[in-house]
Amino acid sequence: SACAEIGYRSAGTLEFLYQDGEFYFIEMNTRIQVEHPVTELITGIDLVKAQLRLADGERLPWTQDDVQIRGHAIECRINAEDPKTFTPSPGPVKLWHAPGGPGIRVDSHLYTGYNVPPYYDSLVAKVIAHGEDRDTAIARMRNALNEIVVEGIKTNTPLHQEIFQHAAFRAGGTDIHYLERRLGLKEPDAEPQRRAMTAGGRSGTFPRA
């Protein structure tokens, strides 16, 4: 209804903050977010294809009432950076092995022999795990993180592994300051630290796309 009110016709993302059982609207981004695979896995809808069809003047073959939420999905952003200091780690990739298995999706441009440049964002891969519930998604993600092999550069994969082993994260209910407290960081709002906390999950009770 917000998009219809302003006459917007394309893919977009409405962002909310969750506090004390309530959702608070922040903003709308007129683009698809990095986390869009989470939405695609729990709805079965290809958002990029839908956006291209809209741009070409086509109508969507479904309505909001047709969209059903199935299961839970979690995404980890794999960055080419030191997992402790968050400093960039560009350079040649001597070996790259992507994880696989049931419910695992990997979006990446990495390959063995690729040279990670120092000029752009450090994101080199997205690993997404989908399962019938949060516990299943977490278990699959933990296996996927253990399967990742990257040699030649540093990545934040060890940080993700540590987060998924932490009982507080597995139990849910962590907030935006979780990583700050966990690692004893002094600057909770610094951009590299914000990007590092990328294990964001969505289920039928979390409306953000």
Where in this protein do the model-derived segments appear?
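Conserved metal-phosphate-binding beta-hairpin within the catalytic cores
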Residues: 8-33
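Catalytic cores of soluble metabolic enzymes centered on carboxylation/carboxyl-transfer
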Residues: 33, 37-209
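N-terminal hydrophobic alpha-helix used for membrane targeting or insertion
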Residues: 4, 16-19, 64-66, 115
